[in-house]
A protein has these predicted regions:
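Transmembrane beta-strands of outer-membrane beta-barrel pores
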Residues: 39-45, 78-82, 113-115, 124-126, ...
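Extracellular loop and loop/strand-boundary signature of outer-membrane beta-barrel proteins
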Residues: 43-48, 91-97, 146-150, 210-214, ...
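Repeated loop/turn-to-beta-strand initiation elements of outer-membrane beta-barrel proteins
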Residues: 31, 69-72, 115-118, 171-174, ...
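Detector for outer-membrane/organellar transmembrane beta-barrel domains
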Residues: 242, 282-305, 310-384
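Outer membrane beta-barrel
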Residues: 70-196, 233, 415-417
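Outer-membrane beta-barrel "beta-signal"
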Residues: 144, 368, 406, 414, ...
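Residues that define the transmembrane beta-barrel architecture of outer-membrane proteins
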Residues: 50-56, 100-105, 156-160, 220-224, ...
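Residues on the lipid-exposed face of transmembrane beta-strands in outer-membrane beta-barrel proteins
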Residues: 39, 58-64, 74, 106-113, ...
Length: 440
């Protein structure tokens, strides 16, 4: 009996010692890791009906608290889309561009000292949040290879930047941003599932398309701006300014003589400098929340098909604005209604972009969200329409929380309208989707 008791005491002591030895060091306690894995499937409904996405996506992010004032964050994302092995529908340039991806989504040093917060590294800087559009969200370039269908946190392309916020007084803060990371919007290649409609040029001469400039670090072309924010009596108001190169290419034309053959028309993608001045506003009038954004872009350029225009580009300063109202019906149906306009300071005749329907282009968006069975079954419907020409996007989705870590999502993306409109250009790209997500 004594031997058994001694053995039990020895085992308890060894277990206790082992537990003490297994105690993680302090630096491990300060580290937080999380991530997700997703399988994304999409099937195109129109002829030729076929699988359009078989993507396996992984995301891993971590945060390390050096101290109460200093922290480090990092996140990586990668994917492999097996649709390029399952079908030969897409050309080689699209496969190279979209089959695989591995990117650093965040690498951020955050320092807080008194009224000053500094964020240095690769990051997303969000100055505005709208439904299916961007008004004052101008700092980060966007990835449009899947149009605007992914979540906006996935659409934004992170940039290397210095971002600091200084609290001037209670309720008033100043944020400054500077970046040498002059990245452009990432556009789908010709032949991609969501390639944009081609500009409707009608040249009689041969045409040469020059490649776009590569993304680069450049002190001479660096970008920056500021946001001044005020919070008073429930009013959240911000004034923003940003100086940048146009994130989307503008195709300038020039005629090159090559006698005795006909002249060649050269289309040269450029990124002219623009200045954005904007304002955001938010206020809760219980039970209604009102939000508004406006951005005036100076020196904005657009392509034109006017045969008398020598370089094929015109300047049109542009005002983008929106007003939205959020309200919950019956204490369970979250409703967001948004009206937005793009207003050109000049004629829209001969302009060719699908997002410009007239001198004043008006859009209406409606998003409905609710939940059933303790929010384990969550339907969402998003409807966006261009009021000028009646093109629209309809995206219903149902998210089912299988467990605390696993979500199953079923949805669709439906488009309709004339071909040279924002949503009508994808009227043959209607699809149904199925996504399984595991978070850890």
């Amino acid at each position: 009996m004594r031997r058994v008791l001694a053995a039990a005491m020895l085992l308890a002591f060894a277990t206790s010692a082992g537990a003490e030895e297994a105690e993680p060091p302090e630096w491990v306690k300060a580290l937080r890791l999380r991530g997700r894995l997703a399988e994304e499937f999409a099937y195109r409904l129109h002829d030729p009906g076929d699988v359009s996405k078989l993507k396996t996506l992984g995301w891993l992010e971590g945060k390390y608290a050096v101290s109460e004032a200093v922290s480090l964050r990092a996140a990586v994302r990668g994917w492999y889309d097996a649709v390029f092995d399952a079908t030969d529908r897409y050309p080689a340039n699209v496969e190279r561009d979209q089959k695989t991806d591995l990117s650093l989504r965040e690498a951020l040093l955050t320092i807080g000292h008194g009224d000053l917060d500094v964020r240095l590294g690769r990051q997303q800087i969000v100055w505005g949040e709208a439904i299916s559009t961007f008004v004052t969200d101008v700092v980060n370039p966007k990835d449009f290879r899947e149009f605007v269908l992914p979540d906006f946190s996935e659409l934004r392309i992170p940039i290397w930047a210095l971002d600091f916020t200084y609290r001037l007084t209670e309720g008033v803060s100043f944020e400054g941003v500077w970046t040498p990371d002059t990245m452009h919007n990432r556009l789908p290649k010709q032949g991609a599932e969501f390639q944009f409609a081609r500009l409707p040029y009608r040249f009689r001469n041969p045409v040469v398309h020059l490649p776009d400039d590569a993304d680069e670090f450049s002190l001479g072309r660096s970008e920056g701006g500021f946001r001044l924010s005020l919070l008073r009596r429930g009013w959240d108001v911000s004034l923003v300014y940003y100086d940048q190169a146009d994130k989307s290419p503008v195709f300038f034309q020039r005629r090159v003589a090559q006698p005795p053959r006909p002249d060649v028309i050269v289309l040269d993608p450029q990124h002219p400098r623009v200045h954005v001045v904007g304002v955001t506003l938010g206020k809760s009038f219980e039970p209604v929340v009102v939000r508004a954004e406006a951005a005036y872009t100076i020196d904005k350029r657009y392509e034109t098909t006017d045969p008398l225009d020598l370089d094929g580009v015109v300047r049109r300063d542009t005002l983008d604005w929106l007003v939205g109202v959020d309200y919950t019906f019956f204490e369970r149906l979250d409703t967001a209604l948004q009206l937005s306009q793009k207003v050109l300071m000049g004629s829209a005749t001969h302009l060719t972009r699908p997002g410009v329907a007239a001198r004043v282009t008006t859009s209406l968006a409606l998003r409905l969200t609710t939940g059933f069975f303790d929010n384990t079954l969550n339907p969402t419907v998003l409807f966006v329409t261009g009021l000028n020409r009646g093109d629209f996007r309809l995206s219903p989705r149902i998210d089912y929380l299988v467990s605390g870590a696993v979500t199953l999502s079923v949805g669709a993306d439906l488009f309709e309208g004339p071909h040279q409109t924002l949503y009508g250009q994808f009227d043959r790209n209607d699809r149904v989707t199925l996504t399984t997500t595991w978070r850890f």
